[in-house]
Amino acid sequence: MGPPRHPQAGEIEAGGAGGGRRLQVEMSSQQFPRLGAPSTGLSQAPSQIANSGSAGLINPAATVNDESGRDSEVSAREHMSSSSSLQSREEKQEPVVVRPYPQVQMLSTHHAVASATPVAVTAPPAHLTPAVPLSFSEGLMKPPPKPTMPSRPIAPAPPSTLSLPPKVPGQVTVTMESSIPQASAIPVATISGQQGHPSNLHHIMTTNVQMSIIRSNAPGPPLHIGASHLPRGAAAAAVMSSSKVTTVLRPTSQLPNAATAQPAVQHIIHQPIQSRPPVTTSNAIPPAVVATVSATRAQSPVITTTAAHATDSALSRPTLSIQHPPSAAISIQRPAQSRDVTTRITLPSHPALGTPKQQLHTMAQKTIFSTGTPVAAATVAPILATNTIPSATTAGSVSHTQAPTSTIVTMTVPSHSSHATAVTTSNIPVAKVVPQQITHTSPRIQPDYPAERSSLIPISGHRASPNPVAMETRSDNRPSVPVQFQYFLPTYPPSAYPLAAHTYTPITSSVSTIRQYPVSAQAPNSAITAQTGVGVASTVHLNPMQLMTVDASHARHIQGIQPAPISTQGIQPAPIGTPGIQPAPLGTQGIHSATPINTQGLQPAPMGTQQPQPEGKTSAVVLADGATIVANPISNPFSAAPAATTVVQTHSQSASTNAPAQGSSPRPSILRKKPATDGAKPKSEIHVSMATPVTVSMETVSNQNNDQPTIAVPPTAQQPPPTIPTMIAAASPPSQPAVALSTIPGAVPITPPITTIAAAPPPSVTVGGSLSSVLGPPVPEIKVKEEVEPMDIMRPVSAVPPLATNTVSPSLALLANNLSMPTSDLPPGASPRKKPRKQQHVISTEEGDMMETNSTDDEKSTAKSLLVKAEKRKSPPKEYIDEEGVRYVPVRPRPPITLLRHYRNPWKAAYHHFQRYSDVRVKEEKKAMLQEIANQKGVSCRAQGWKVHLCAAQLLQLTNLEHDVYERLTNLQEGIIPKKKAATDDDLHRINELIQGNMQRCKLVMDQISEARDSMLKVLDHKDRVLKLLNKNGTVKKVSKLKRKEKV
């Protein structure tokens, strides 16, 4: 993987307002310049965007539809692929790496592009240059010889596989619709990989794209897609992390079926898609799956998705459309390739070579993706998921794993990825503001099969990006649908990105176990803010069971992230969902799923189906500020997972902001912090409304999804029982209803399958009736509230209401509440906070949990500090994007870093100050007997004094060095000041004095070191006697024992 190439034909300059931004799409693996002529469609710009922060963004305005350009590109790509192939397998797809540039968000202004125009970038999947290309054209789907070139991942990709995927011609299309103001489009990069069809237009972006990516930050402003290119592996992760945006993909409800129906359709669809406006895409393109990757980060929002894996995809086909809540149109379609596409979905579009067979392989290959790519971002994970379901194997793939309908499956996959992205939305409605953005969803879900991916590559994104965890989707699990969910648990995420403790990791795989990483430790507070971390890219397999396990920590993490919310996030709880992710899966929501509820409401209860994110916006998108909405929609498509994911992501951002709110629900301190949360809550509600759009798409998906998700749900529910009991109750039944529900509630629906469902059962109709109903806070709210009150944690009722928003909300809310509650407890520590049984020392009691490591300031924060903090957080202006599309993010001044400030032991005071004599006991010194010493292991070695000799040798070297310096100084002195002329010149005199002083120092040092060395070696004077004693005493005993054994 070479350094990024300079912009070439692949580079696209966004037209229109975004003129400043350019995308560069590079083949991830190859550096060679593309052979094909520059595509006409793309305008070339000599400069790269990468440098500027804006690179990440792609101008929504620019649209590159040229097929001819694409073709040329394809041909070039093919050359490339042939040029080197790491693997002979055709299936390999080459991941496209999109490198998000963190600064991008800020730098570029977002210009709204004509809403209609889609931007598609076709380029070989080379790593994108820093600039983010909106779309990749995976080229045509021809299967070129796949060279597997490693793409350069942005983030480390844990597995080497990253490079694996050869580049396959695939296109990623990113659709952004600037027009959507409020949603702030996040450019979505859609990768439409057609695996098989070379000619498909990859640009699914329809003109309207609708912003498939929603800009997460400002509701209105588009997000940068900057990070949107998908990088393979680390890059993807990074992208994810950086971008704030979240894309929401919303599958069309009907499409999904259609999609499943015929893989072939995809092709057709593709082309049509091109021409068709984005809006249509969502419906029209059933076959195509849209994977939107949204990077959650503003920056790299979307990578999205890969082509559908063909077969699976096809089934899945449901295209995801990213719907912005604001603009409903957005959709990203991933055409399902022929079903066979492997759909590696590796982020990069995978070549999908066109053969369907690959699909099966893809699973294996997927690994590649997964391994190699952390791509958290949309990373094709979504697609992957589909594919991943290996069992599905080929087209049927829909097959078992996926959702009942293939579409679902695909969705799932995409879903995580997209929604993950979506989730990411930057919205940080909450005061959190900046930090929030990190929430960017990290959900890149990489469903990649590859378990190996076990850890998604973590992507470190900026703080914003959380890493999604990609769950491995295990095809075996039925939950596969949900599987894809991303959890945003920061916790889970493998430690890969520990750094962001906060990020949520999306867990994509439902089945796999989730690896918990306690990322969140720090997260709780900042998590959201920091949000970035986390991202663990690693995929975690969630096991439903595991999930449960996770959930506590997850919750915590999430919470951390969300502070509490996340934790409740149910995802933890959510975990209940069968897909481990389920919780997330719950709803497509995925992460949220269980959380979903939370999400909305959850906020408090992170559990919320929707986003676990604190925002709790109904739609994840909303949640995240702008992007969130998208997520929800996506989730629908994914049915369960996606939606959730989106939400989650958003959530997380919100969480950051909201964290407190969420937290409030969960832990006491958080509760105290409630005020901060309050601020967030309102946002949540708003967000919620956004969610509405989601509902529609959801429906479709949910139906398909429904089955599996539902199934998954119950298990999940059970798993998290403690937290989710209520949820479960609601959920289970609902789970069946879930289908209806899913359809209904946009975001939740899927997740609803689980979560939503829970709430939904009755509501399902409601939901179906309309998101708005769902949204209608009243009903859900009530439910939530009830839940909340019992939970106590739910405290932030308002947050819950948002959940309510989601239709799921009610149930979800409950779930969330339940979850959240436990979760809330969890956040502070891995486990829920308990009141100490005994009165601890006064001091420790004052300090708060004695052992809480994180307790630092946080711990203390009582209502008062919380309020203060909340105010402080709120004080900076909220992020906003000005008319020119430039996004302003308030930066919270951080206290200077000192060694002491960040290390404070909350329990130390209690240890060193005693209230009663009995607290102190003199330690009795035990004198070692000679025999005991002699029997110690390695005692004879120590007696030899090897350490002393080693040290003595080093001291000798020091004296030799000093001697050498002394000699040089002597020569210098003689050379500069011959004879006694020194006195004549002041300067010479001064130099002479300095030399003389240094010589004296050298002598002194040599003498002292030699003396020290000699006295040190005297310790060994008694060596012989000591060894004699040791041998006499030590061995006798040992020998006697051995002899006894021998005798026996």
Curated annotation (Swiss-Prot):
Q: In Gene Ontology terms, what is a biological process of this protein?
A: negative regulation of stem cell population maintenance
Keyword Ubl conjugation tagged: yes
Which top-level group of life is the source organism from? Eukaryota
Cited InterPro entries? His_deAcase_cplx_SAP130 (IPR024137), SAP130_C (IPR031963)
* Compositional bias (Basic and acidic residues): 67-80
Q: Which family does it belong to?
A: Belongs to the SAP130 family.
- This protein's name: Histone deacetylase complex subunit SAP130
Q: Which organism is it from?
A: Homo sapiens
